[in-house]
Amino acid sequence: MPEGPRKLLDASALLAYLQRELGFEAVREALREGAAISAVNLAEVAGKLKARGKDPERIVRRLLAMGLEVLPFTLEEALEAGALDPLTRPLGLSLGDRACLAAGRVRGLAVLTADRTWAGVYLGVPVEVI
């Protein structure tokens, strides 16, 4: 695997991969090449898995063994996410969405998402809708 992640996964992208939904192949390829997820977005994934009766800890351990990197949510990213609020509020993007976009901007990583709302959105970070 290359040094450091090459793509940043939004919660929706990782969930699409885990559930073999539309676009999961793009996430599988990103995982092979080196992918990361913000701890904020991983919390979203864990919550959804738990709500569906799955064992988030077991699933996350498996993803980590595959090379998924979990990135801490930094002060710089928190401030960036706050700055994105007025720009993304009209689009209905959540705090988790802004956290992902902020992490991508700060770390210089393209973001993969399954959220079609992000199509055509450019806030200083490349977004790939799977």
Label the model's feature ranges.
Residues 13-14, 41, 77, 99-100, ...:
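Alpha-helix capping/helix-boundary segments
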